[in-house]
Amino acid sequence: MDRICNEALLRKVTTPRAAAAHIKNGMTVGFSGFTVIGYPKVLPAELARRAEEGEELGITVITGGNVGDQLDGVLARSGVMKRRYGFQGNRDLRALANADRIQYVDTHVSHGPYLIKNGYLGKIDVAVIEVAAIRADGSLVLPFSVGIDDTLVKYADKLILEVNEAIPLEVEGMHDILTLERAPHTQAIEIFKPDDRVGSPYLPCDPDKVAAVILTNCEDTNQDLPAPTPDMEAIASHIVKFLQSEVAAGRLPNPLP
């Protein structure tokens, strides 16, 4: 509880089951996470449980990038995920999409905020955001990824926050979050040297939009990569030989940077 410094949000702490009840059949739900980091890990299991117990529950899922199996895999295998926007790398989700059991749109990771802000993905009913902590003013300390969290928090009708105690509090201060306006009102990003900061280390959040807060203690899962095949090793060898020949011919610097 010491990670939640806002009194109003402290009163909204509840169980995963109660928090998941805010998500209904047919909703569009945005989830935090990027590069298999900073995604909700507890609430998806509650949604899967409801479906496995016979409830009719199907949702559209939006993420800013690749997330872990506790989200994509769990929702895909349980049948909760009916449509998915954003990059993904889950084997089960991919198989179900290729079998036409999940409608999948492979939107580029840079296009998510634009599509959401301009209404191309429809209304976002709920956004589920993993955070390291909540400050006294309600602003959020994000984990090791930001992705499209700022867009989801701003445009979703309702928010559910997963406060993950497994995230080290030292993450506070590492981010520089700048939310741009909708086109054609997008402003310039005034970064001219490496130490320029143009945004905030924290993500502003309206406490009135938060429907529920749940406490978790879950590590991010690393994606298992397959062992290299002979073809993969041959490709890598060809690339190395090509670069070495380019250096020898004087077309690339020696040593390579």
Describe the predicted segments one by one.
Residues 1-257:
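Conserved alpha/beta enzyme-core scaffold
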